[in-house]
Amino acid sequence: MARSPVEPPASQPAKRAAWLRAELERANYAYYVLDQPDLPDAEYDRLFVELQRIEAEHPDLVTPDSPTQRVGGEAASGFTPVVHDKPMLSLNNGFADEDVIAFDKRVADGLDKATDLAGTVTEPVEYACELKFDGLAISLRYENGRFVQASTRGDGTTGEDVTENIRTIRAIPLTLKGKRIPRMLDVRGEVLMFKRDFARLNERQRAAGQREFANPRNAAAGSLRQLDSKITASRPLSFFAYGIGVLDGADMPDTHSGLLDWYETLGLPVNRERAVVRGAAGLLAFFHSVGERRESLPYDIDGVVYKVNRRDEQDRLGFVSRAPRFALAHKFPAQEALTKLIAIDVQVGRTGAITPVARLEPVFVGGATVTNATLHNEDEVRRKDIRIGDTVIVRRAGDVIPEVVSAVLDRRPADAQEFVMPTECPECGSRIERLPDEAIARCTGGLFCPAQRKQALWHFAQRRALDIDGLGEKIIDQLVEQNLVRTPADLFNLGFSTLVALDRFAEKSARNLIDSLEKAKHTTLARFIYALGIRHVGESTAKDLAKHFGSLDPIMDAPIDALLEVNDVGPIVAESIHQFFAEEHNRTVIEQLRARGKVTWPEGPPAPRAPQGVLAGKTVVLTGTLPTLTREAAKEMLEAAGAKVAGSVSKKTDYVVAGADAGSKLAKAEELGIPVLDEAGMHTLLEGHAR
């Protein structure tokens, strides 16, 4: 069913109402029949409320098939239709506290509750409060305690027979227990999928190379409406009972809360997040209490439901065409909404990560007005095919950063533009590079880039780097925010008067920091390399670089092939080092540190190259405890024979030498089929007898 291409203006109520009916019906079909919802709940609700308003103002425009007159959806062709003995109606929605107060007032008026002169209800109504699950509504029919049929809500009057699929859900009893077993019981409830089960299902889908589900609701609906019940049986579905259709052969409980208590005695699963309250104040207290805990709940909910608790009062209030007067669904602020994507900029993180950010037309979602949303990385933009000018679905849940979920493709304008990742950092002009096998592109101006400045300074001052005692994060924040320090070289120009002027920085602290800076000028090459904050270069690699090259300039000028000769330096690390020193801004800061900052370290000749022995070009990994050799002695023997001794096992490893208590490295070698030697085998290898 195609989306209506032209949206008539509100000034033409007849055309507007017809368009709204068609659009809502199309959305209902996608939601209920195809299980492919393409309209966020908030947008559907907005269109529905608008249609209600037009029909209220123009009663002659109401049609029998209007979405306002029924629930929506129709039986899928693959399932047998089931006519409900009692309609499965939807609920009226409330979105603001005022809607709840108005609902309570209507109920009190309908029940002739006492009020004071100001119209305030003095005899509060008793309500049962429960959660509004984001799943699929189901009717379960039991005859003499035995489960005989299950059906979906469908259009509220006619649903789909899903009996065989429901039988596979372990939470649903096939036989009721207890003493008060009715001749016939029609249980209403919700099939859903818990968050943890949803995550595990998608893991299985990924492993099998199958399509992942967008959310738990889609997963539950798609699982339940399988023509092959074996597929449903493999899916982790759950169920909660919350209502009743027809009852025969037993007394109806006097209250809704009593009904749910009775269900528990019958062995039906009932959610415990419920309460009985009085008046609008009690309703709102329950709503806000649940809202505070919403993200920590093990399942998705999109609101709470209020029902007049007493059954006789429910009967007095009755129904309107599509919903009971005695109940209200109080929805949380929508977590998804539609808006237009105006532009895509890039943001530079503290570690240089380049993140595409969507600039949006303001939209209220998740309880806040959103104008920006993350697009994560370039690959995600391509995968989702998101373009500038698109109408997009934006999601914001709790404190999670807003994200663009998808583009609405049939609303894409002809002039929509594809995103192009910039080649230069917007903050400092340095090159943007993306290493092989990494999703994140990064600015290469680590020592120079303003966006990375605080992180670079903090790392530079670490104990394992230049060990500048007294230069903590709060001091760095002040120095950067007051533009006193732009690069690590500027640290060595700080004077006493500058430091004592900082907030909460006493004279003694200033003198101590100046002393620490003076001491930091005398360091080692390995510490200095580590202090530069080169991506993938830790302490161990910094030491290996210093030992291999002996001085800084050869490292700065080394081609990738030369870097690959360093112990434990692979292609990714070599590429990262090469890119760092290829960036002119970084080289400038290093020269400032050596000249203006006068940071020095002892330098020496490069390490002697290993002779071209029997193991030239081979990579060996040591693991466990050898009988007669220390790890260091074995390493020296192997390197003397031309081998590269690596710290981890990979497909490029030629041999693993294993001693006692060898652990995961040995297991990895066996998994990859790499030859494993003991100490005697290593000696044989060194003698040139093994190939």
UniProtKB/Swiss-Prot annotation:
<dbReference type="Pfam" id="PF01653">
    <property type="entry name" value="DNA_ligase_aden"/>
</dbReference>
<dbReference type="GO" id="GO:0003677">
    <property type="term" value="F:DNA binding"/>
</dbReference>
<feature type="binding site">
    <location>
        <position position="425"/>
    </location>
    <ligand>
        <name>Zn(2+)</name>
    </ligand>
</feature>
<feature type="binding site">
    <location>
        <position position="449"/>
    </location>
    <ligand>
        <name>Zn(2+)</name>
    </ligand>
</feature>
<dbReference type="InterPro" id="IPR036420">
    <property type="entry name" value="BRCT_dom_sf"/>
</dbReference>
<dbReference type="GO" id="GO:0046872">
    <property type="term" value="F:metal ion binding"/>
</dbReference>
<dbReference type="InterPro" id="IPR012340">
    <property type="entry name" value="NA-bd_OB-fold"/>
</dbReference>
<dbReference type="InterPro" id="IPR041663">
    <property type="entry name" value="DisA/LigA_HHH"/>
</dbReference>
<dbReference type="InterPro" id="IPR033136">
    <property type="entry name" value="DNA_ligase_CS"/>
</dbReference>
<dbReference type="InterPro" id="IPR001357">
    <property type="entry name" value="BRCT_dom"/>
</dbReference>
<keyword id="KW-0862">Zinc</keyword>
<keyword id="KW-0479">Metal-binding</keyword>
<keyword id="KW-0436">Ligase</keyword>
<dbReference type="GO" id="GO:0006281">
    <property type="term" value="P:DNA repair"/>
</dbReference>
<feature type="binding site">
    <location>
        <begin position="90"/>
        <end position="91"/>
    </location>
    <ligand>
        <name>NAD(+)</name>
    </ligand>
</feature>
<dbReference type="Pfam" id="PF03120">
    <property type="entry name" value="DNA_ligase_OB"/>
</dbReference>
<feature type="binding site">
    <location>
        <position position="331"/>
    </location>
    <ligand>
        <name>NAD(+)</name>
    </ligand>
</feature>
<dbReference type="Pfam" id="PF00533">
    <property type="entry name" value="BRCT"/>
</dbReference>
<keyword id="KW-0520">NAD</keyword>
<dbReference type="InterPro" id="IPR010994">
    <property type="entry name" value="RuvA_2-like"/>
</dbReference>
<feature type="binding site">
    <location>
        <position position="428"/>
    </location>
    <ligand>
        <name>Zn(2+)</name>
    </ligand>
</feature>
<dbReference type="InterPro" id="IPR004149">
    <property type="entry name" value="Znf_DNAligase_C4"/>
</dbReference>
<dbReference type="InterPro" id="IPR004150">
    <property type="entry name" value="NAD_DNA_ligase_OB"/>
</dbReference>
<dbReference type="InterPro" id="IPR013839">
    <property type="entry name" value="DNAligase_adenylation"/>
</dbReference>
<dbReference type="Pfam" id="PF14520">
    <property type="entry name" value="HHH_5"/>
</dbReference>
<feature type="binding site">
    <location>
        <position position="130"/>
    </location>
    <ligand>
        <name>NAD(+)</name>
    </ligand>
</feature>
<protein>
    <recommendedName>
        <fullName>DNA ligase</fullName>
        <ecNumber>6.5.1.2</ecNumber>
    </recommendedName>
</protein>
<keyword id="KW-0235">DNA replication</keyword>
<feature type="active site" description="N6-AMP-lysine intermediate">
    <location>
        <position position="132"/>
    </location>
</feature>
<feature type="binding site">
    <location>
        <position position="190"/>
    </location>
    <ligand>
        <name>NAD(+)</name>
    </ligand>
</feature>
<dbReference type="GO" id="GO:0005829">
    <property type="term" value="C:cytosol"/>
</dbReference>
<comment type="similarity">
    <text>Belongs to the NAD-dependent DNA ligase family. LigA subfamily.</text>
</comment>
<comment type="function">
    <text>DNA ligase that catalyzes the formation of phosphodiester linkages between 5'-phosphoryl and 3'-hydroxyl groups in double-stranded DNA using NAD as a coenzyme and as the energy source for the reaction. It is essential for DNA replication and repair of damaged DNA.</text>
</comment>
<dbReference type="Pfam" id="PF22745">
    <property type="entry name" value="Nlig-Ia"/>
</dbReference>
<feature type="binding site">
    <location>
        <begin position="41"/>
        <end position="45"/>
    </location>
    <ligand>
        <name>NAD(+)</name>
    </ligand>
</feature>
<feature type="binding site">
    <location>
        <position position="443"/>
    </location>
    <ligand>
        <name>Zn(2+)</name>
    </ligand>
</feature>
<dbReference type="Pfam" id="PF03119">
    <property type="entry name" value="DNA_ligase_ZBD"/>
</dbReference>
<dbReference type="InterPro" id="IPR003583">
    <property type="entry name" value="Hlx-hairpin-Hlx_DNA-bd_motif"/>
</dbReference>
<dbReference type="Pfam" id="PF12826">
    <property type="entry name" value="HHH_2"/>
</dbReference>
<keyword id="KW-0460">Magnesium</keyword>
<dbReference type="GO" id="GO:0006260">
    <property type="term" value="P:DNA replication"/>
</dbReference>
<dbReference type="InterPro" id="IPR013840">
    <property type="entry name" value="DNAligase_N"/>
</dbReference>
